[in-house]
Amino acid sequence: MDKKTVKVIEKYSMPFVQLVLEKGEEDRIFSDLTQIKQVVEKTGLPSFLKQVAVDESDKEKTIAFFQDSVSPLLQNFIQVLAYNHRANLFYDVLVDCLNRLEKETNRFEVTITSAHPLTDEQKTRLLPLIEKKMSLKVRSVKEQIDESLIGGFVIFANHKTIDVSIKQQLKVVKENLK
């Protein structure tokens, strides 16, 4: 992505995030943005919106479908993007808003990868430790299973990783034996 595009994305996302914080609607916007992001990624919408061959009005109609199920603040934001013919940047702006909102509120989605599914009790005990060790607040937990870890888990949030898997420990032992 070129610098000009990044500047355009920031032009929309920065004021929107500031407005969300002023209005105190972080929880609702986090929820709305996360749901839209999941739908957009599953449907391959970013590539559709970036296609030059697709008419601008079709792109605007497509992103307008999201307006019915989100907060009024986000409805207006989507409308501004459509009005300014920025539907092609919809996904990029959405992701940037989510990232900026996470940084501003220090509330992040945490990904926990383990060899076996964690119980609710394990998650409950783990969350305060994650918040303390990573100096952040857990907004949501995304759980992944990776049997190659053998045991233990890997925690990822805010570009930080805590790896206490048996796979990692074996790797360290192997390196020390060289």
Swiss-Prot record:
InterPro entries linked to this entry: ATP_synth_OSCP/delta_N_sf (IPR026015), ATPase_OSCP/dsu (IPR000711)
Bilayer topology annotation: Peripheral membrane protein
Q: What is the role of this chain?
A: F(1)F(0) ATP synthase produces ATP from ADP in the presence of a proton or sodium gradient. F-type ATPases consist of two structural domains, F(1) containing the extramembraneous catalytic core and F(0) containing the membrane proton channel, linked together by a central stalk and a peripheral stalk. During catalysis, ATP synthesis in the catalytic domain of F(1) is coupled via a rotary mechanism of the central stalk subunits to proton translocation.
Keyword match rRNA-binding: no
Give the record's GO CC terms. plasma membrane; proton-transporting ATP synthase complex
According to its UniProt entry, one GO biological process term is: proton motive force-driven ATP synthesis
The subunit field of the Swiss-Prot or TrEMBL record says: F-type ATPases have 2 components, F(1) - the catalytic core - and F(0) - the membrane proton channel. F(1) has five subunits: alpha(3), beta(3), gamma(1), delta(1), epsilon(1). F(0) has three main subunits: a(1), b(2) and c(10-14). The alpha and beta chains form an alternating ring which encloses part of the gamma chain. F(1) is attached to F(0) by a central stalk formed by the gamma and epsilon chains, while a peripheral stalk is formed by the delta and b chains.
Q: Which family, according to the similarity comment?
A: Belongs to the ATPase delta chain family.
UniProt xrefs under Pfam families? OSCP
UniProt subcellular location: Cell membrane
Q: Which gene encodes it?
A: atpH
The name on file for this protein is ATP synthase subunit delta
| Entry keyword set | ATP synthesis, Cell membrane, CF(1), Hydrogen ion transport, Ion transport, Membrane, Transport
Q: Which PANTHER family match?
A: ATP SYNTHASE DELTA CHAIN (PTHR11910)
Major place of residence: membrane
Q: Name one GO molecular function term.
A: proton-transporting ATP synthase activity, rotational mechanism
Which Gene3D superfamilies is this protein grouped with? N-terminal domain of the delta subunit of the F1F0-ATP synthase (1.10.520.20)
Keyword Cell cycle tagged: no
What conditions trigger expression of this protein?
Induced by a decrease in external pH from 7.5 to 5.7.
Native organism: Streptococcus pneumoniae (strain ATCC BAA-255 / R6)
